[in-house]
Amino acid sequence: MAAKDVKFGNDARVKMLKGVNVLADAVKVTLGPKGRNVVLDKAYGAPTITKDGVSVAREIELEDKFENMGAQMVKEVASKANDAAGDGTTTATVLAQAIVNEGLKAVAAGMNPMDLKRGIDKAVVAVVEELKAISKPCETSKEIEQVGTISANSDETVGKLIAQAMEKVGKEGVITVEDGTGLDDALDVVEGMQFDRGYLSPYFINKPEAGTVELENPYIILVDKKISNIREILPVLEAVAKAGKPLLIVAEDIEGEALATLVVNTMRGIVKVAAVKAPGFGDRRKAMLQDIAILTAGTVISEEIGMELEKATLEELGQAKRVVITKDNTTIIDGIGDEAQIKARVAQIRQQIEDSTSDYDKEKLQERVAKLAGGVAVIKVGAATEVAMKEKKDRVDDALHATRAAVEEGIVPGGGVALVRAASKVATTLTGDNEEQNVGIKLALRAMEAPLRQIVTNAGEEASVVARNVKDGNGNYGYNAGTEQYGDMLEMGILDPTKVTRSALQFAASIAGLMITTECMITDLPKEEKLDPAAAMGGMGGMGGMM
């Protein structure tokens, strides 16, 4: 086992604080409408330019191991805030730095760290309750646009795009961010249920100019097995031909004779058919087939429950207004499924999201909810260079997470005002069990002014003057650092999602509390590299001439 370096008490805390400040000082320059950029060197390719707090935090690794421990703990604050709400990483870092600095001063003055931590925890619980009380629902498209604009560093085009996307696909719909091809941002919306399986044969194409298959008012048969024998599907084909409607076959696979016969029938115009593979694999495929069945009021023909394809009737087939199939995707538009059943299915999948521990599973389940609930919107980000594209994509991603958080838990006045108001209210009523807890409460409430002060500092103004003016006001009254004006933050469109502010405060206080109560730090001693004896002798080859 490697030898360890151990530091105690104030020596340990001073080192840790130095690491905290290095990381937080690098992150906090990005806060607010006039926050600056940070340039990150990359091993390959061009450097990355960002205003995203967590991206800056992730890059920082310090040489001194004790300082690095402090930096890594604050990095954890930014990461946790990012995971929980997708935004608020810089606010969380600024809060953590403020609480740690204030807390360690109190510890150095001889206060009991455990009582300080209890006081901080009490203050945070009370302020979170107060934030919930002043929060208002985020319902209108205008409010969603404002939240997106603020989170994208006052970029109004991003706010507008996100608001449009949410309007099109609903608040549950999936919105993804991709690289665009031009200079301008664009929004693509896919309505209905789309899955990533294209036609099994190009001979099904009936719109050659677009290279797609389009079926109007088709029947849809869903089969949970491979179809290789045409006899199995013949009864359904005959029934559909009599009904005079097209047919979409969604099966695990269709091969050999069965596929050839379907192609021939389509080319001769006997029956209009298209076939695609079922989306997903294994259990996920079964679940997605069931989703399509509920959306189209059909039944999955599955041998597992004793159903036979040869005995399938028109009643077991789903229907939709329209189906569009490209070589890569199939889109089912306006399935005739029962609204109540679709809602029940969505609720069931949401419960699975709650229970799931895997991020990958959660993402896939969320996609299924979106496909059932409304559709998918794609925001294509445009920029002049790749570096600018990356930076903008990060901002759009942040804004997207912020608007989702706002829809979920509501909005509070932005610009650090919500924390100042909540802290002022709590300060008049909250007391601890002893004097040291009261100090903990006071230092936590004082630290909650830090985001407002940092926003003002980054805008080049005097933080103490603005903080005093904001505290003298009430309600939504605050300072707009973008326009350097005071006024009602909600009316000026300066909004923060309640969830983002709440998460930032809770994670910052949690990690800061652990740091304040640290008394000992242990790390590996650096290993001394021993010289290889053979390498050391390498320079002696020329000694032969000494004789």
Swiss-Prot record:
Pfam families: Cpn60_TCP1 (PF00118). Keywords: ATP-binding, Chaperone, Cytoplasm, Isomerase, Nucleotide-binding. ATP binds at residues 30-33, 51, 87-91, 415, 496. GO terms for biological process: protein refolding. It comes from the Bacteria. GO terms for molecular function: ATP binding; ATP-dependent protein folding chaperone; isomerase activity; unfolded protein binding. It is found in: Cytoplasm. One of its GO terms (cellular component) is cytoplasm. It catalyses: ATP + H2O + a folded polypeptide = ADP + phosphate + an unfolded polypeptide. Its main location: cytoplasm. Its EC number is 5.6.1.7. Together with its co-chaperonin GroES, plays an essential role in assisting protein folding. The GroEL-GroES system forms a nano-cage that allows encapsulation of the non-native substrate proteins and provides a physical environment optimized to promote and accelerate protein folding. PANTHER family: 60 KDA HEAT SHOCK PROTEIN, MITOCHONDRIAL (PTHR45633). Belongs to the chaperonin (HSP60) family. Forms a cylinder of 14 subunits composed of two heptameric rings stacked back-to-back. Interacts with the co-chaperonin GroES. This is Chaperonin GroEL.
